[in-house]
């Protein structure tokens, strides 16, 4: 089934499963009705502002916090940690210098991580190696760190072949990104 990733203002233009992109948590609360929540695959918050508005809203709806500058924005994870009680919670971040600190904090707060990997330089490769080590050897890690989790699961279980496009939710056969102009 295809999931359309749409800005909150276009929710009603797309029937079926949707991933809703908002700039702040309060926008999701204001724009999505209870009826809409049944088709929402996730809410992606693109600003590291406090998410208190989501605590009593849409219980069970997955929340993906996009952290554009993980080396700077990582303290905002403390504000979101309590949401994990009512929502599956994940933080998505680019692999830029300093992202390891954000990954460590997310893991300690029991928040899943999705790494958005571009063409890494030597510093990013070193940090990625440290993240893999953290994921494999820190016994308190209980949430997945993607893309490592899915790649390792595919290797261990030898199931159906997969691609990084599928793992990173960028396969156009499964995920379609709709820009603000629709």
Model feature map: region roles:
Residues 2-181:
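Radical SAM enzyme [4Fe-4S]-AdoMet core and its adjacent flexible, acidic
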């Amino acid at each position: 089934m295809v999931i359309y990733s749409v800005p909150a203002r276009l929710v009603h233009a797309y029937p079926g499963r949707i991933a809703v992109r908002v700039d702040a948590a309060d926008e999701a609360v204001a724009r999505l009705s209870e009826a809409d929540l049944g088709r929402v695959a996730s809410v992606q918050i693109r600003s590291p502002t406090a998410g208190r508005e989501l605590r009593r809203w849409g219980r069970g709806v997955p929340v993906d916090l996009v952290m554009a500058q993980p080396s700077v924005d990582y303290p905002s994870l403390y504000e979101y940690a309590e949401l994990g009680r009512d929502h599956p919670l994940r933080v998505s971040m680019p692999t830029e210098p300093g992202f390891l600190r954000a990954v460590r904090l997310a893991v300690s707060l029991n928040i899943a991580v999705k790494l958005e990997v571009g063409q890494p330089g030597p510093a990013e490769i070193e940090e990625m190696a440290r993240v893999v080590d953290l994921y494999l050897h820190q016994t308190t890690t209980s949430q997945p760190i993607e893309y490592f989790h899915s790649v390792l699961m595919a290797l261990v279980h030898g199931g159906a072949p997969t691609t990084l496009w599928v793992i990173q939710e960028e396969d156009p056969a499964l995920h379609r990104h709709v820009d603000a102009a629709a």
